[in-house]
Amino acid sequence: LTKEVFKDKPNKYRYEPYRRKLAIMRYRLKLTRDRIMQPVEDGQLPGMGGYEHEQQFLHDLYLIRDSLYSHDDKQTADSELKDLIRLAETFGFNLVNLDLRQESTRHTEAVAEILEHAMQREYTALSEQERVDMLGKLVASGQCKLPDRQLLSDATCQTLDVFTVMKKMQEEVSPRAFGDYVISMTHAASHIMEVLFLASLCGLAGKRNNEWVGNISISPLFETIEDLEHIEPVLESLLSNATYRSILQSSGNAQEIMLGYSDSSKDGGIYASVWSLYQAQVRVHAIARSRGIRIRLFHGRGGTMARGGGPTHETILAYPPGTVQGETKFTEQGEVLFYKYNNPETAIYELSVGITGLLKASLNLVETPPEVDPQFLHAATSMAR
């Protein structure tokens, strides 16, 4: 790349190695940016030499830092360069992790159509356990291949296109480009396995060279009170599937579960909703402990009280004892984003009260959490009926 960068002035920065290195890095970043934006801007494909992923960029930054350290120039290395390294480590080339969300019936319909054309199997005629078992075997074996798209409906093609774009963006932008794939209205373990199957057809999950690969994080969303009450058998069935457990282990052995506050509140009232959510969190963490996996709860709340809103600090502290383990995740409704994060002062305040609440709620990691009075549990259950 040196000839291309300095083709007009080959001796530029000849005696300034750091500036010369930074000029090459800047050129590589431009090539990377042009490659990513080419489909959007309909421009020409850039030449070779850009960064393939943020780790290559970080490697160059670390190289400069270590060189400065070796020359006893720690002050320079720990100033603006350190800030840039932290930005690159935190945000990569993607800035944020984009979460995706789709309703469960779209996946069921897509899977049924694909299996009908590819394997002449009537998916909808199978029982719940048969669906889970068959999908697990197909993901593990890679036996099912995508049929000709001309045979598929527009809805199924649109569903598959999401996974195709995920695969492409992970390769072209960053492996961290996407966060979680949320399945709304999750009623059964097969709804999670359907997403895993569709992801495997597009190269996001399965087996490669006899090793499990899971480049998608699936987050089932339990929204109604009935679904919250059945969360235990759904997770037990899911985590009993050997294929799903293997892929989960290959991607960090962490499972995210999203809990819906708005729909459960409309379904049974605010109090019944809150208590069902409380019990669901306790049951989910009990399953996680018994299965040896890590659980992160994603709280779909915010805004008005009916939608699970409330002060951030107190809300986190109200989670069941022992269920917050150093991390939490919750939504912020559009109507409150402006008031909370419109200027740096209020944004810093909101993040501060959230972090302090998280630290307090995570004390169970270093000390035994207090036990909840059984009389309280009995009274709360009676009131929620």
What does each model-found stretch correspond to?
Residues 1-172:
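Extended, charge-enriched "interface" segments that sit outside catalytic cores
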Residues 43-50, 63-70, 143-154, 173-185, ...:
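Glycine- and acidic
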Residues 113-115, 199, 236-237:
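Extended active-site and interfacial segments that coordinate phosphate-rich ligands
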Residues 202-383:
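Catalytic or ion-translocation cores adjacent to nucleophile or general acid/base/metal-coordination motifs
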Residues 90, 182, 297-299:
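A structural signal for short, well-ordered beta-strand segments and their strand-loop junctions
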Residues 51, 55-58, 62, 75-82, ...:
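Conserved structured core elements
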Residues 72, 167-177, 199-206, 239-243:
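Structural motif corresponding to the C-terminal cap of alpha-helices
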